[in-house]
């Protein structure tokens, strides 16, 4: 189960990097609506990553 949380965290981090990269390109093109949308997706996936790290640690302390 620990490995599932690690893979899910890595996947969500990859998605957040992708949306951050898209936000940067929309900022350079001055398309502010798409930039803010991509920043919010980036923040969403970063929060999912932090949550899954917390779940992994919480599961570890529950077993001991």
UniProtKB/Swiss-Prot annotation:
Alphabetical UniProt keywords: Cell membrane, Membrane, Transmembrane, Transmembrane helix
Pfam family, one: YpmT
Keyword Secreted: no
TM regions (residue ranges): 4-24, 35-55
Record-level GO cellular component terms: plasma membrane
Recorded topology in the membrane: Multi-pass membrane protein
Coiled-coil ranges from the UniProt annotation: none
Covalent S-S links between cysteines: none
Compartments in which it is found: Cell membrane
Signal sequence region: none
Name of protein: Uncharacterized protein YpmT
Species name: Bacillus subtilis (strain 168)
